[in-house]
Amino acid sequence: MAKFFLTAAFAAAALAAPVVEERQNCAPTWGQCGGIGFNGPTCCQSGSTCVKQNDWYSQCLPGSQVTTTSTTSTSSSSTTSRATSTTRTGGVTSITTAPTRTVTIPGGATTTASYNGNPFEGVQLWANNYYRSEVHTLAIPQITDPALRAAASAVAEVPSFQWLDRNVTVDTLLVETLSEIRAANQAGANPPYAAQIVVYDLPDRDCAAAASNGEWAIANNGANNYKGYINRIREILISFSDVRTILVIEPDSLANMVTNMNVAKCSGAASTYRELTIYALKQLDLPHVAMYMDAGHAGWLGWPANIQPAAELFAKIYEDAGKPRAVRGLATNVANYNAWSISSPPPYTSPNPNYDEKHYIEAFRPLLEARGFPAQFIVDQGRSGKQPTGQKEWGHWCNAIGTGFGMRPTANTGHQYVDAFVWVKPGGECDGTSDTTAARYDYHCGLEDALKPAPEAGQWFQAYFEQLLRNANPPF
């Protein structure tokens, strides 16, 4: 899996800061603080400044400086850097970003957001603030069609998961997101908001990929580093026990243990993957937390030769972890393109009888339950709106043509085994470059069914975002 670092510099005229007494009513760091049609707060909480990105969007950026006088305000240019990393999950790429600073956990929880049954019921899902800023600062300024601009603005408000793919993201993105949600809930959000987070930092991560580049190696204290990462997540989640938190656990990892044990890196990582996944499930077993282990997708573990070994593996992990209450089930189609339910199988799925996620889950669940794991499911539909896609083969994962934004996140799935349809991967970040001379070039990104020309993995891919937007089903 390629890991790409992108420095995004934001610089614009900073707005004057309000007096301290008013800041409790201001937007949090990374929150929106202005723009055409925006009716929310136009000031920022202490430590950040409202910076205009374009006519449609102003954002609270940390560390911005502003000087004021009694009659006028003089704005200085502010630059905020964020590290951006990308990860290939189930044959495609997902993105997560982190500010390069550490924040202090404000206050403490006075209640516990415990739940019974489906953790997606009785809550609202939180829209990813960084993805919102990407859409408003990178996508919308390049769109001239007013209707498409309005549609893009609507995409920015769709709740999506936040990825913790490096240790630095724990004390930055996780704390900031939970702080923002706490503030919104304390301000009277009804129903309250819940957080959606991806735990994703195993050593020797994504073992079957052509160019894995996670931050830790098993041979270099990786297991202990990962336990520290999980321990810190646990500490923060306990501090925010008033915020219900839904976790996807380690995309690709266990699925690779089913199908890719012929890959030396995977066979070498197998025992560590199992040990650390069990460690994470035990440590994050908290009353306000719900966990879903990643279980690939219909075109991966859904094949008849793979589905029973997959059931055996996931049930064994669940049992060895002590059947934690917070382990609700499995996540499928993470960062992929598969339909939830389609009337006839696309040609590229043949001859798999489980040609969509519904068939996969309905075949998978009884096998799991028979082994003591009555798993519920969540299904990523962020890029699954257009069916069939333009893929020539099911394994063609990179920037697939003919895709669109899919059904919006909801707990109203109409299916007894499915807790929610979700957007684990927000659309618009590139899966990989089509430049054959690039160091991170993967041949999948140069295939005829991959959209080209494509920038490096993790960079904003405007043409792909607009493809998803134009093909969205339902439309925005």
From Swiss-Prot:
* Region described as Disordered: spans on this chain: 67-94
Annotated region Substrate binding loop 2: where?
423-461
Q: Which residues are glycosylated according to the annotation?
A: 144, 153, 167
Q: Name one GO biological process term.
A: cellulose catabolic process
Q: Which GO terms describe its cellular component?
A: extracellular region
What positions does UniProt annotate as the active site of this protein? 252 (proton donor), 431 (proton acceptor)
Q: Which cysteines are joined by disulfide bonds?
A: 33-50, 44-60
Signal peptide region: 1-16
Pfam families from the UniProt entry: CBM_1 (PF00734), Glyco_hydro_6 (PF01341)
List, for all copies, the residue spans of the domain called CBM1: 33-60
**Which top EC class is named for this enzyme in its record?**
hydrolase
Q: Which reaction does it catalyse?
A: Hydrolysis of (1->4)-beta-D-glucosidic linkages in cellulose and cellotetraose, releasing cellobiose from the non-reducing ends of the chains
- Under Enzyme Commission nomenclature, its number is 3.2.1.91
Q: What does this protein do?
A: Plays a central role in the recycling of plant biomass. The biological conversion of cellulose to glucose generally requires three types of hydrolytic enzymes: (1) Endoglucanases which cut internal beta-1,4-glucosidic bonds; (2) Exocellobiohydrolases that cut the disaccharide cellobiose from the non-reducing end of the cellulose polymer chain; (3) Beta-1,4-glucosidases which hydrolyze the cellobiose and other short cello-oligosaccharides to glucose.
Q: Which family is this sequence assigned to? A: Belongs to the glycosyl hydrolase 6 (cellulase A) family.
On subunit structure and binding partners, the annotation says: Monomer.
What is this protein's name? Exoglucanase-6A
**Provenance organism:** Humicola insolens
List the lineage, top down: Eukaryota, Fungi, Dikarya, Ascomycota, Pezizomycotina
